[in-house]
Amino acid sequence: MCQFISWVEEDNKPYYLDNKALKTKEGKSLLKYLRDNDSLCDLQGHGALRRYYSELKGRNQECTDFSTPENFPKEIVNSIKNMEMTNILFGDETPLVLLNSEGQAEYQKIKQSALAEYKKIKQPALWKLFKQEKYRNKLWI
C-alpha cells in the first residue's frame, strides 16, 4: 500500500491530493468511490491519485521521511505548512517529526487518553455485536 505522502510527477510538477481537491466534484466522487469500496485508507495512495488525475502518465513518487522538508517537492511542503492536507489520511506511521518535542509530548498524552478510552469499550463492543447473529461469522452461528 502506498504511504502518505504520495504524488505523481509529470513534467517536473507534482500532482497530489489536498483538502481543496477533495472538495471538487471529482474529489467528492473519489471519496464516495473509496467509501463504497471500503478502501478509504487508500486515499493517500497512487490508486486514488490515478483515479483523480486519470489523464496523467507521469511517475509515481512517495516519501515517508519527514526529517526535512527537502525530501518533498516545494508545492507539497507549502501545502503541509499551510494545513492544506489535513483531510488526507496518514498510513501506519504518523509523522510525529512534524512536531517539536513539546508538541510530540502533547500528542502522546492525547493518544494515550484516546487509547485508554478505546480499551474500555473494545471488548464490550465486540460482545454486543457478537450477541446479534446477523453480525456473526457463519462459522460461529
Language-model features, listed with the residues they occupy:
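Short, glycine-biased loop/turn motifs at secondary-structure junctions and
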Residues: 1-141
